[in-house]
Amino acid sequence: MKNISLLGASGSIGTQTLDVLRSHPDQFRLVAFSAGKNIDYAVKVIQEFSPQIVSVQREEDVLKLQAVSGNTKVVYGSEGLLEVALHPDAEIVVNAVVGSVGLLPTLRAIEAKKTIGIANKETLVTAGHLVMEAARKHNVSLLPVDSEHSAIFQCLNGENEKRISRLIITASGGSFRDKTRDELHHVTVEDALRHPNWSMGSKITIDSATMMNKGLEVIEAHWLFGIPYEQIDVVLHKESIIHSMVEFEDRSVMAQLGSPDMRVPIQYALTYPDRLPLSDTKQLNLWEMGTLHFEKMNQERFRCLRFAYEAGKTGGSMPAVMNAANEVAVEAFLQKRIGFLTVEDLIEKAMNHHNVIARPSLEEILEIDAATRRFVMEQI
């Protein structure tokens, strides 16, 4: 029986993580979770899983939840997130919160020698050097939950990582993959939220449409697998059947395939190095698929992917700036305060405005994050 702490239980990855726990009650126990502002959902999780701790975002929600939480302790805010991440009984901490708020809980959980199931992209994007140094220092495993990084992780099982020639990350292309840039001037929030292949939260669905999601994954892959940016490619693959590939020195390519279902990489992270049945996921029959399609990525068409490569190669504090600018811009688009292509413009402005710090401390990263958010808000 593995004890799990789950940060971000009410989001897309969080709810599917609970699906995995539900499928294997003899294998996993939820000891703590966070649920942001989603109090009704938190009540349901408490009633079903009887965890010891729940964290919510706002202090005013604590009393509401305490009235129905029974023996479950209710905490709140950033300190509450840390309490969930540092639960003494938790062996695995799944970080599924969205945004840079996931950084500090990850670092503290690593220091407490917890195994990390990492679904929070921003942790590695903003502070990859700090996170990987801490993981090495404390001998902690970072297990990828993203389907693309899980695919690479599985392809590398038993392989000599020094023999890697290239990582090939696949991209569905998002909601607007078939639109021209001219057509993107007129797209709506509702259009952007209709992803052709995956069911995800609103922020990541917009990131998928701008291709920033793939850019964040490139930076993540650089840190997780220690591969230079020049050896990480992105290929457009509309069917989302091949989740990523690894090319080795001898030009052989290993690929991980499967029907699009986030529970597969989530469960693999929780069971690694073992596997468990996942009987209600769709079996992949290639003869039903027929043809798989691949296209070279156009970084002028998808400018956010180019920004991510530039930020990653620049290094230091630049990825944190790009990430903070993107979070503010995406939120403004979701609120219908800016157009879709303005997201790119705001990110570019923030990156051009920033003076890079080569090896920022945690405090500097948090300061840069806050300053960038203020700068972008002033531009809107």
From Swiss-Prot:
Catalytic activity: 2-C-methyl-D-erythritol 4-phosphate + NADP(+) = 1-deoxy-D-xylulose 5-phosphate + NADPH + H(+)
Pathway membership, UniProt: Isoprenoid biosynthesis; isopentenyl diphosphate biosynthesis via DXP pathway; isopentenyl diphosphate from 1-deoxy-D-xylulose 5-phosphate: step 1/6
Annotated SUPFAM superfamilies: 1-deoxy-D-xylulose-5-phosphate reductoisomerase, C-terminal domain (SSF69055), Glyceraldehyde-3-phosphate dehydrogenase-like, C-terminal domain (SSF55347), NAD(P)-binding Rossmann-fold domains (SSF51735)
Cofactor needs: Mg(2+); Mn(2+)
UniProt GO MF annotations: 1-deoxy-D-xylulose-5-phosphate reductoisomerase activity; manganese ion binding; NADPH binding
Residues engaged in binding Mn(2+): 146, 148, 217
Protein's job: Catalyzes the NADPH-dependent rearrangement and reduction of 1-deoxy-D-xylulose-5-phosphate (DXP) to 2-C-methyl-D-erythritol 4-phosphate (MEP).
Name the UniProt record assigns to this protein: 1-deoxy-D-xylulose 5-phosphate reductoisomerase
